[in-house]
Amino acid sequence: MEGEGRREDGDCSYLCIPFNSIRDIFQSFFTRFRGLTPDNSPVTISQEVEEETEVVNIPRSVVSGNVAARKGKQQTSSGKGGGTN
């Protein structure tokens, strides 16, 4: 009976993962669970910077006007390849 992970021709069929990938995976888990940044310094509330985003409401008439202008500029295809559609 042959060992697990071996083929009949003698070659191993084990999965090979580079060490750097394993190290990066473990580092991301440790930093997430311990509340540390990737450079291993603790995160405090005073150091966190909130990014502000501005929400702008655009009237529907402005949006539909732009779509109508684009539809008028479309060219019909001649049916030949390589042309402008």
UniProtKB/Swiss-Prot annotation:
Q: Which UniProt keywords apply?
A: Plant defense
Chain intervals for the UniProt region annotation (Disordered): 66-85
Q: Which Cys-Cys disulphide bridges does the record give?
A: none
Highest taxon in the source lineage? Eukaryota
Pro-peptide positions? 1-62
One Gene Ontology term of the biological-process aspect is:
innate immune response
Q: Where is this site: Required for ligand-receptor interaction?
A: G79
Q: List the InterPro entries.
A: PEP
Q: Which Pfam families match?
A: Pep1_7
Record bears the keyword Transport: no
- Role played: Elicitor of plant defense.
By sequence similarity, the record places it as follows: Belongs to the brassicaceae elicitor peptide family.
Q: What is this protein called?
A: Elicitor peptide 7
Q: What is the lineage of its organism?
A: Eukaryota, Viridiplantae, Streptophyta, Embryophyta, Tracheophyta
